[in-house]
From Swiss-Prot:
InterPro entries according to UniProt: DNA_helicase_Holl-junc_RuvA_I, Hlx-hairpin-Hlx_DNA-bd_motif, NA-bd_OB-fold, RuvA, RuvA_2-like, RuvA_C, RuvA_C_sf
Protein name listed in UniProt: Holliday junction branch migration complex subunit RuvA
Listed HAMAP family: DNA_HJ_migration_RuvA (MF_00031)
Written domain comment of the UniProt record: Has three domains with a flexible linker between the domains II and III and assumes an 'L' shape. Domain III is highly mobile and contacts RuvB.
Job description of the protein: The RuvA-RuvB-RuvC complex processes Holliday junction (HJ) DNA during genetic recombination and DNA repair, while the RuvA-RuvB complex plays an important role in the rescue of blocked DNA replication forks via replication fork reversal (RFR). RuvA specifically binds to HJ cruciform DNA, conferring on it an open structure. The RuvB hexamer acts as an ATP-dependent pump, pulling dsDNA into and through the RuvAB complex. HJ branch migration allows RuvC to scan DNA until it finds its consensus sequence, where it cleaves and resolves the cruciform DNA.
Region (Flexible linker): 143-154
Lineage: Bacteria, Pseudomonadati, Pseudomonadota, Gammaproteobacteria, Enterobacterales
The entry's keywords: Cytoplasm, DNA damage, DNA recombination, DNA repair, DNA-binding, SOS response
Gene Ontology molecular functions: ATP binding; four-way junction DNA binding; four-way junction helicase activity
Domain II: annotated span: 65-142
C-alpha cells in the first residue's frame, strides 16, 4: 500500500502529475483543487495517496492532506461513485465546499458536477451526511475553502488544449469541455487557470 510520496515533480499534465521518488516515477491522478497547489516542475512535493487496483490497471490518486484523502475514500464507498467520479467531484469543488453542500443538502450544486444526476446527488447527501457524523472532529479547516491560485504562465493554444483535455479526463464531453474553455479563454491564462475558471463557471 502506497500512502505517501515525497519526491521531485517531473511533469504536470492535468489532472496527472509525475513524481520521481528514489529514481522511480509515479504517475498520480489528482483532483484539480489539489493540483492547483502543487509546486512547479523540478521542485519537491509531498502527496498523500490512495492506491486502487483494477483488473486492467493499478492507479494512484493523490491529495495535499490526509483530510482530502479521507473524503475521497468515503466518496468511493458510495454506491455508483468510483474513483474517476470522485476525482471529478473534488475537481469541481473543494473538499470543504463539498462537505458544505452535503451538510446543507444543496442538490442543485451537486448536479452541476460532471456525472452527477439528481438521484446520485441525493444519494451522496444521504450517505455522506451519515459518514460525516462518524468522523471525529471537523473533517476540514476553514483554510481548505480558500481560493487557490496557480502560477501564472503565458497561455497558448496548447494551454487551451490542455485545459480541454483535462476537463474531458474529469468526465465532461469533448464539445462541452471546449465550450467551457472558450468562454473564459484569454491570452495571459495558463492551462491550470483555464481549468480552474472553467470549473468555477460551471458551478
Amino acid at each position: 500500500m502506497i500512502g505517501r510520496l515525497r519526491g521531485i515533480i517531473i511533469e504536470k499534465q492535468p489532472p496527472l502529475v509525475l513524481i520521481e521518488v528514489g529514481g522511480v516515477g509515479y504517475e498520480v491522478h489528482m483532483p484539480m483543487t489539489c493540483f492547483y497547489e502543487l509546486p512547479e516542475a523540478g521542485q519537491e512535493a509531498i502527496v498523500f495517496t490512495h492506491f486502487v487496483v483494477r483488473e486492467d490497471a493499478q492507479l494512484l490518486y493523490g491529495f495535499n492532506n490526509k483530510q482530502e484523502r479521507t473524503l475521497f475514500k468515503e466518496l468511493i464507498k458510495t454506491n455508483g461513485v468510483g474513483p474517476k467520479l470522485a476525482l471529478a467531484i473534488l475537481s469541481g469543488m473543494s473538499a470543504q465546499q463539498f462537505v458544505n453542500a452535503v451538510e446543507r443538502e444543496e442538490v442543485g450544486a451537486l448536479v452541476k458536477l460532471p456525472g452527477i444526476g439528481k438521484k446520485t446527488a441525493e444519494r451522496l447527501i444521504v450517505e455522506m451526511k451519515d459518514r460525516f457524523k462518524g468522523l471525529h472532529g471537523d473533517l476540514f479547516t476553514p483554510a481548505a475553502d480558500l481560493v487557490l491560485t496557480s502560477p501564472a504562465s503565458p497561455a497558448t493554444d496548447d494551454a487551451e488544449q490542455e485545459a480541454v483535455a483535462a476537463l474531458v479526463a474529469l468526465g465532461y464531453k469533448p464539445q462541452e469541455a471546449s465550450r467551457m474553455v472558450s468562454k473564459i479563454a484569454r491570452p495571459d491564462a495558463s492551462s491550470e487557470t483555464l481549468i480552474r475558471e472553467a470549473l468555477h463557471a460551471a458551478l
